[in-house]
Amino acid sequence: MTTAAEAPRRRPSGRYAVRALGNWMNLSTPLGLLISRVGGCRVRRGPRRLWLAEGYRPAFPFARAFTVGNVLVGRGRWSPGDTRLLAHEERHSWQWLLCLGPAYLPLYTLAMAWSWLRTGDRASANVFERDAGLAAGGYPERPLRPLFGGGPVGGRRVSPPTTPRARSRSGR
């Protein structure tokens, strides 16, 4: 009987190799490594051909963690207990691949703007964050606001003026 230490290491499946190669070729992983270096991170190999960058210092972007290609960038240290957040960020690495690399940035920005318009925050209606799992990424799910006919952004209606002149024009 072989122990876990004696068992041969299993190589990650082919899909992870495809993702790693694709994100390297579309230049998103090199960009992620550059961002992590500029951000003062320590970088180490992670699971499933990912890179884990730890100790990101700049204030932007405003997130506990973010992903660029196959590089998962975190403000703190990645630990084995971060399974939900790791899975969330790993899903973003697949999104980088499907968006052909740097095209992800303007698409994500548009999705973030749409989410802010519809919910008042950047994640609740963001198709990329919803696909990666809102709760796993630490985002609350906010309700949708009306787009049209609900008054100003935020869905608040403005009451009509109540001066005597305004009432006389309305026929009341």
Spans of model-derived segments:
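Metalloprotease/metallohydrolase-associated module, dominated by Zn2+-dependent proteases
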Residues: T2-Y56, F60-F62, L100-R172
